[in-house]
A protein has these predicted regions:
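Catalytic-core regions of core metabolic enzymes
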Residues: 1-689, 697
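Acidic, glycine-enriched active-site microenvironments
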Residues: 674, 693, 824, 828
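Short, basic/aromatic-enriched C-terminal tail that caps enzymatic domains
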Residues: 691-693, 878
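Long, contiguous binding/interaction regions
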Residues: 698-883
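A short, sequence-level motif marking secondary-structure junctions
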Residues: 543-545, 693, 731-734
């Protein structure tokens, strides 16, 4: 996520083309031609010993002979010379370099050289980049592109060229167009951090084939998506496609889970990609999900309506006030409804009247206007009428409007007019609805991320006991644990299992059954047969000694016949669970090669494929995220309530999933967990059969997770000067209500010192931003005092680091009635220790000149205090890890 050098790459002031040429088909010629044609304002310096000048620009024979150091260099020579040229550029002090072609065996040396000179690399095997606002075309593409607000990042040169050609035909603009190539250094996450802060970029589109660091990607994407919509198209969904792309990009459901968790939106194919470009380029943000449709024909409106229904969209309901206004504005016989059918003879004036009335209405959140070719109402005239209505109406700038002018030839001019007016336009009713639902789903994803999680009823977690059990199993040489061995681990996390007994043979199985009572379940115990059902290794409802004896002997005989090499470690005997009216579920945890542990929920089966039969989520889970996983499984028919007499307890299942998530986060030894079946009966959940795969683990246990979990190790009990004990801990999403109550007990004066303005009310979004933080990017510590009656926040301190992890901005706020207890100092000392341990170099903050308490505290803790009376601020700075 480093931003070092990206300014020089994306906003260079000078460029050197290494290997510039006058031969038309050479890379050096194409790069020089495009740079000069793009209108770049800075110097472009061709470097070649073969020519005195290239395309009329004085050439320099070597890198060393350049009159000054370029911000950006482009290597256009034979790949064999890459390393020596990169070394020369580093010695010259060049900050960034685009490598157009290279061989994988060069990569380690290239990366080492770049790191030595603190140089950033784009590529290798990159098409280059275009930055129209800088007049920069440092690419092979001969297609000029217009200035726009959409940034496009691609891992494929072929897809990049396709999008460029498509956008040129439609005169669509971009803020940046970047082809990453093999991402040896600069990667998607670096660019997302840059574009999130770029004023020329309002939306981002990604084409991805693989990830080098899932955690960095999810962190950067989540941060950027809070302010700008980001759409993703990901290829390589099938193993065959991954093989073709030479990329192991993991399970496709894992990508869906990561994209949703980061607040992004995924589009599935090229057709949707083109619609997404149109949407991101022109559509205004949605304030809600209700759609109003107006059309000059019932058929296209019906097609739109069908697609909306298939995608679970919402149709707006018209108020009587709006209906009356439409009746007065439109001819007699027009049925006032949604969709509004203006009839096939609707003139441009009818369109304008209808739109003017609808612009006065608050009944909908987006307006779709459809036009079918008609002799009575030419498409161009109707388009001009719509544009005119939006231009002159006071609400025209604020209403989200989509247009669908059907047809091809007859609608070309109308689509051009809409594009010039900044209105999204699509060729089909279905495509328009697809685009609308993209933005609806994006809005839902963002809303989901900002919801305040509910607190679970109670969570059991005896981490030390679980670790001890797993470690002992590893020391004993076990790689797989069966139900009776896993049960103590699950119970340590509050997951209920059935009591299980081990029998060496059929005779002992009969003896156990006689002791515990019938009916019983009998299960094979073999480390070599993971799926017992493959050999009928599970027998249920055995009611007599004879049935148990017969089932046990038959089970062992079947294994000896079908799996002669399999080891048989006896049998498991369980009391038969009451399955009447219950539902059988399956919870699986697997490790994805890209995103790490995945939690999967479904109903199971012998040939169980997560891609088809499970809803998938990334740990860690809170109650809200677990609830969304359950709802997703139900909605997508991964869980069906066909046999349950009692409805599924969604809250109870969500809590169990949170417990599974906590187990996986806390215990990195667990490689795989399969609870199948999980018996759900009302609010009771029982793991009937469990398999756990384990392996020794060393190092940072959090490194395997795509999302950093809550850092329990940072919790600390502190005694204040008045003797009260409080817990210093990282902030949690569940803290939102407590944080609001805390702010209510801070005086307006103290809030003004903290926020530099008068804030009358903190919205849910404000509080969500404060509590739902990414622990990889920022940290907030709260001081919490707990009594029998309540738990309350007494103070907060936070630090937000820059993407390069060099500087962090800090703030601290203590409840106004608790000043003088040393709370602010203790909180700030904890924050200083944390930022120092994470390698930051400086901790910076600002306050007001009359905030004497903060200034005094800063001086005591070693901050440099710079009072800037002209600006009305005091800058505070503390060096942390310098020298």
């Amino acid at each position: 996520m480093s931003q070092r050098g990206l300014e020089a790459l994306l906003r260079p002031k000078s460029i050197a083309v290494i290997g510039a040429s006058m031969k038309p088909q050479r890379a050096g010629y194409l790069m020089m031609r495009n740079l000069l044609a793009g209108g770049f304002n800075g110097p472009v310096m061709p470097v070649t010993p073969a020519w005195k000048a290239v395309l009329g620009v004085l050439a320099w024979p070597t890198i060393e002979s350049l009159p000054f150091t370029p911000d950006l260099a482009v290597l256009c020579t034979n790949a064999r010379r890459n390393l020596e040229l990169l070394e020369a550029l580093g010695q010259k002090g060049c900050k960034t370099c685009i490598i157009l072609s290279s061989q994988p065996e060069q990569y380690p040396a290239l990366l080492e050289c770049a790191a030595r000179y603190q140089m950033r690399l784009l590529g290798p095997n990159s098409l280059g980049l275009l930055a129209p606002w800088q007049g920069l075309n440092a690419s092979f593409s001969p297609v000029p592109i217009h200035r726009g607000k959409l940034a496009f990042i691609s891992q494929s040169a072929a897809v990049s060229n396709t999008i460029l050609d498509w956008a040129q035909q439609r005169e669509m603009g971009f803020s940046y167009f970047i082809a990453l190539g093999d991402s040896l250094d600069i990667d998607v996450d670096d660019l997302l951090d840059f574009l999130a802060r770029d004023s020329k970029t309002s939306a981002i589109l990604l084409y991805l084939e693989h990830l080098s660091d899932a955690r960095r990607f999810v962190s950067a994407a989540r941060s950027a998506s809070r302010n700008k919509p980001i759409l993703v198209i990901k290829s390589g969904r099938s193993p065959a496609a991954q093989k073709l792309l030479h990329a192991n990009s993991g399970m496709d459901p894992a990508w869906d889970a990561a994209i949703q968790r980061a607040g992004l939106l995924r589009v599935q194919d090229t057709h949707e990609l083109f619609s997404a470009v149109e949407t991101l380029s022109h559509m205004r943000p949605l304030r809600g999900e209700k759609l109003m449709i107006a059309s000059n024909g019932a058929a296209p409106a019906a097609l739109a309506l069908d697609e909306l229904w298939l995608r679970n969209g919402k149709l707006a309901a018209l108020s009587e006030e709006t209906r009356d206004a439409l009746r007065q504005a439109l001819p007699v016989g027009v049925e006032i409804a949604n969709p509004l059918d203006l009839r096939d003879d609707a003139s441009s004036e009818h369109y304008q009247r209808a739109v003017n009335v609808l612009l006065n209405s608050q009944d909908y959140d987006a307006l779709l206007v459809i036009h079918s070719p008609s002799a009575a109402a030419p498409g161009t005239e109707s388009a001009l009428a719509l544009i005119d209505a939006l231009k002159h109406h006071p609400r025209g700038k604020y209403v989200t409007v989509l247009t669908n002018w059907c047809g091809e030839f007859s609608s070309q001019e109308a689509r051009r007019l809409f594009s010039d007016a900044g209105l999204p336009t699509y060729r089909t009713p279905e495509g328009t609805i697809t685009a609308f639902m993209h933005m609806v789903e994006y809005r839902r994803n963002q809303k989901q991320l900002r919801e305040t999680p509910v607190l679970p009823d109670s969570l059991t977690a005896n981490t030390s006991e679980a670790h001890a059990l797993l470690q002992q199993a590893i020391e004993d040489g076990a790689t797989t644990l069966d139900t009776h061995e896993v049960s103590p681990v699950l119970r340590a996390y509050g997951i209920h299992t059935l009591p299980t007994w081990i029998a060496a043979d059929s005779a002992e199985a009969v003896h156990i059954a006689e002791q515990i009572g019938y009916p019983v379940a009998l299960k094979l115990r073999s480390p070599d047969i993971p799926h017992k059902s493959e050999v009928q290794g599970v027998m249920l409802y055995l009611r007599t000694a004879a049935e148990v004896q017969q089932a046990a002997d038959a089970m062992i005989d079947r294994v000896k016949l079908a799996w002669p090499q399999a080891r048989i470690h006896g049998l498991l005997v369980q009391s038969m669970a009451n399955r009447a009216g219950a539902q059988e579920l399956r919870v699986v945890v697997e490790h994805d090669p890209v995103f790490g542990p995945l939690i999967m929920l479904g109903e199971g089966g012998v040939e169980w494929r997560a891609e088809d039969q499970a809803a998938v989520a990334l740990p860690p889970l809170n109650m809200n995220l677990a609830r969304y996983l359950v709802i997703q499984a139900i909605k997508n028919k991964k869980i069906r309530g066909r046999s349950a007499l009692r409805p599924l307890d969604i809250a109870g299942l969500s809590q169990l999933l949170v417990q599974v998530s906590n187990l996986i986060v806390d215990c990195p030894e667990i490689q795989r967990l399969d609870i199948h079946p999980l018996l759900a009966s009302g609010n009771e959940f029982t793991a009937l059969d469990v398999t756990l795969g384990l392996a020794p683990f060393s190092g940072d246990s959090e490194s395997r997770l795509a999302i950093r979990p809550y850092p329990h190790q940072l919790e600390e009990w502190v005694v204040m000067k008045n003797g009260d004990r409080c817990l210093f801990r990282p902030i949690l999403p569940e803290d939102e209500p407590q944080l609001l109550a805390f702010i209510a007990q801070v005086t307006k004066e103290d809030l003004y010192y903290r926020y530099f303005s008068e804030i009358n009310e903190f919205t849910h979004d404000d509080l969500a931003n404060m509590t739902q933080i990414d622990y990889d990017r920022e940290m907030a510590f709260v001081a919490v005092r707990t009594s029998a009656e309540k738990s309350e926040i007494l103070g907060v301190t936070r630090a937000i680091s820059d993407p390069d992890n060099i500087d962090a901005e800090f703030a601290v706020l203590v409840r106004s009635d608790l000043k003088g207890l040393g709370l602010g100092r203790r909180l700030l000392e904890k924050l200083i220790a944390y930022t120092q341990s994470h390698g930051l170099q400086r901790l910076n903050g600002i306050t007001m000149p009359n905030n004497r308490g903060m200034i005094g505290l800063a001086r005591k803790l070693g901050f440099t205090v710079d009072i800037q009376l002209e600006d009305g601020i005091v800058s505070l700075s503390l060096p942390l890890n310098q020298g």
